Amino acid sequence: MTNIRKTHPLIKIINHSFIDLPAPSNISAWWNFGSLLGICLIIQILTGLFLAMHYTSDTMTAFSSVTHICRDVNYGWLIRYMHANGASMFFICLFLHVGRGLYYGSYTYFETWNIGVILLFAVMATAFMGYVLPWGQMSFWGATVITNLLSAIPYIGTTLVEWIWGGFSVDKATLTRFFAFHFILPFIITALVMVHLLFLHETGSNNPSGLISDSDKIPFHPYYTIKDILGILLLILVLMILVLFSPDLLGDPDNYTPANPLSTPPHIKPEWYFLFAYAILRSIPNKLGGVLALVLSILILMLFPILHMSKQRSMMFRPLSQCMFWILVADLFTLTWIGGQPVEYPFIIIGQLASILYFMIILLILPAISLFENKLLKW
């Protein structure tokens, strides 16, 4: 009798994806972040579901319902802070996952890569709408500022913003629809993740060398299942240290003040994981230009397969490209820092220089260095 694992219509899909999957023998810990993102998504959906059981999406009661969750619901504080800090862990894993893809040339699987970029957009949209739900000061003003950016779109801008708001300002209708979208999007993300994996399993995983690994494959289980479990334990450890020791470390104290349309906080800023994009947005004095730069700062990831000029896939054997990659990482850290600073000298000019450098490295410097490295191969 054949093993049910290999014959059952449903179980065999799981088998081909997680058990008998041939995987390269040399993939490093940088390949753990895919599974960690899956765990983050599961944690977020589960904690979010339990929060939704007690949350009310009404401007009058939203803030107090979150307070009620933290004070009166059994372990409500734990669920709430796991959800809030789970989002931070999600983005840490996302950035590392994307960085791994850039460093090792994984973007040459362009269907997998492009679905990944769409996933990044979807997760960012979900996180933004989730931040609005507690209806604190930063929730309200963050929603006002970011949705207002759409008014920069010529001709239809103002109408579009009022349509999204469901009125003439961010109000009850906005909060209700943001809750609805925040609830549904993670399930759309889950479906996209399955498509992401489907395309990945068409080609198999990349590996640190960037070379074809067909001649040296090992089964996913037990080798990478145990490796993933170690990664998951470390992720949960870091998350729980954050949740139990300093749950508000990454939050904004302004969000503990109920939303008040009549008083603007001195510094409106998003959560830390959007600060790099926010800095790029602010570095351009023109509204439409800023919005375009904001969108392009993420959309530019889709250009990497086209901009790949090197004869080698991975950066493992390309020291000049490696150096430029780490300068890009440092530039993103700089942008993140600038995004959280007030709009004044010297932060404005630092932000503008960092924004120019960001686009220059990706569009000009990395491809040019790749071509130079191709020449070096002939020496």
From Swiss-Prot:
Keywords: Electron transport, Heme, Iron, Membrane, Metal-binding, Mitochondrion, Mitochondrion inner membrane, Respiratory chain, Transmembrane, Transmembrane helix, Transport, Ubiquinone. Heme b b562 binds at residues 83, 182. The chain crosses the membrane at residues 33-53, 77-98, 113-133, 178-198, 226-246, 288-308, 320-340, 347-367. Its cofactor is heme b. Gene3D superfamilies: Cytochrome Bc1 Complex, Chain C. CDD domains: cytochrome_b_C, Cytochrome_b_N. Belongs to the cytochrome b family. The cytochrome bc1 complex contains 11 subunits: 3 respiratory subunits (MT-CYB, CYC1 and UQCRFS1), 2 core proteins (UQCRC1 and UQCRC2) and 6 low-molecular weight proteins (UQCRH/QCR6, UQCRB/QCR7, UQCRQ/QCR8, UQCR10/QCR9, UQCR11/QCR10 and a cleavage product of UQCRFS1). This cytochrome bc1 complex then forms a dimer. This is Cytochrome b.
